[in-house]
Amino acid sequence: MNAIIVTGGDIDISLLENYIAENKEDVIISVDAAITKLEKINVIPNIMVGDFDTLSDGEKLKKYENLNVEIVKHDPIKDFSDSELAVDRAVKDDIKNIAVFGALGKRFDHAFANILILQKYKKIGVDITIYDKYNKIYVKSNHFILEREKLWGKYISFFSLEGKNFMEKLEGVKYPIENKIIYNIATPSLYISNEIKDDKLEAKFSGDLLVVESRD
C-alpha cells in the first residue's frame, strides 16, 4: 500500500491531480490547511492530520468527520511538524512508499526539515519522494539504476547526507564519476546538474545520498 501526503506548501494543482488520477488506490493524507488544495480538484482524503492552526473554518473539520474521514488532531505545541506526523500516521499502517506534495513552500525551515525527513524514514525502510513542478527529491542507499525515459526533467544531482560518501561509480551520465568522495562541505556543488546520456545511469556508493531530479 502506498500513500500520497499533501502538505500546505506550494503545489502545482494539475501535477497533483494527475498523480492522484494515476494512483487511485493510494491512501491520501491531507496535512492541516492542505485540504483547501484537495477541494480544488474535488478529492476527499482518507485521513486529515495536523494541529489545524491554519484552518480557520471549524465547520470544515466537522464536514469531513461526517464523510468518515479520519481526523488526527495534534496540539499546536509539539516536537514534530505536521508533515512528519503525517508520515508517522502512514507508517503506522505499514505504508512503505510515500509521495509528498507541497513540501517545498515559502518557508525554507519547513522545506529543509521535510528534506531531512527523507533520510530518517529511509533508515527504517520507508521510501519518500517529494514532488513539485520542477523537482523530484528522494534518498537512495548504496546502489540504484535510473532509466533516462523516467527522469523527471533534464538534470540529476547528488548530495551527501552523511558528511561524505564514497562514489565507486556513476556511469551513463554526461559527467561520470569513479572512486571519488562526495563532500557536503568541501565540494557541495560539484555533483549537481548532471545529465543522463545513455539509456540509463547506474550509481554505486556508500551510505545515503540525496538525489534531486530537476527541470527548468
Model-derived regions: residue spans:
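N-terminal beta-strand-loop-alpha-helix module at the start
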Residues: 1-64
